[in-house]
Amino acid sequence: MLIKELSEQVKKDLKDYFQERDYMVIAVPKKEPVRVYVVKATNTVETARRIHNLSPSATVAMGRAIVGALLLTSLLKHGTNQKLLLKIEGDGPIGTIVVEADAKGRVRGFVGNPNVDTYTKEVEGKKKFDVAKIVGKGTLTVVKDLGMGKPYTSVVPLISGEIGQDIAYYLYQSEQTPSAVAVGVKVNEDGSVKHAGGYLVQTLGGTSEKVKELLEKRILSLPPVTEMMEKGMRPEDIAVEILKDMEPQLIGLKEVEYYCPCDEEVAKASLFLMSTQELEDLFNENELAEVSCNFCGRIYRFDRSVIEEKRELEKKKGENGEKKD
């Protein structure tokens, strides 16, 4: 395990190494069982915005979900093939938000309505996106695939629709871990992403009441994540601010990115979910069949030859005693 004091030199080294790339830091105080995860995801959310041609409101809502899903990868074993799916189903105008993230820091997602109109509200005299209205009331579902057979699924009600609070509620209800979660996205006048990031603070068993109270007061006094990023603060700086006077130590790093592993074989497999007759009907009406990936927008095109491939597949299944589709 990487263990380094979060000194000025270490912070400089991190800045020199990651530069403008997105990444997550994991930090702990020297003497208390507390974990702090801080992620910068500006480029990742901007990639999602461009892929899905998101409106500013959709960018902020989906961006928060992306940041939240990346923070939730703290539940996964680092560097493995474990992954999780975060699904927000509200009755607001954006519809369903789906984000998938894995233990290697790769994330992808999509929203029901990428062109949702702008909804704003006044907060301390400043105009902010009204994410709660964009999302609406509904449920938050987290599906963890730990590579152990059946995935673990948890569903909790959305308590605010602001996404950060909803994730904290999920962690408390489903993981029995008291947590503070902050997620934020700031967009430029042209709709592009200026800042996106967030943090997750968890107090584990054995944390003293004094430290719990100190952390609670400190977190309540922190400015929004995007304001800290606007001041030039990087993930390690925010971690140090949260763990100030607790001898913060760096114990983990992870680069994050928008990544979709879809390919032609995966797309073809989705066609094979159709029966041979359904494929025949499809190609009687169309010269080519198109399969579009919801996560990245790639389009895969197939001709009638897939019908013969489907027949061959069914023939092999029959020979092996498997049930045909």
Curated annotation (Swiss-Prot):
GO terms for molecular function: protein folding chaperone; unfolded protein binding. The keyword Zinc applies. Under oxidizing conditions two disulfide bonds are formed involving the reactive cysteines. Under reducing conditions zinc is bound to the reactive cysteines and the protein is inactive. GO terms for cellular component: cytoplasm. It comes from the Bacteria. CDD domains: Hsp33. It is found in: Cytoplasm. Keywords: Chaperone, Cytoplasm, Disulfide bond, Redox-active center, Zinc. The keyword Chaperone applies. It comes from Aquifex aeolicus (strain VF5). Redox regulated molecular chaperone. Protects both thermally unfolding and oxidatively damaged proteins from irreversible aggregation. Plays an important role in the bacterial defense system toward oxidative stress. One of its GO terms (biological process) is protein refolding. This is 33 kDa chaperonin. Belongs to the HSP33 family. Disulfide bonds join C260-C262, C293-C296. HAMAP family: HslO (MF_00117). InterPro entries: Heat_shock_Hsp33 (IPR000397), Heat_shock_Hsp33_C (IPR016154), Heat_shock_Hsp33_N (IPR016153).
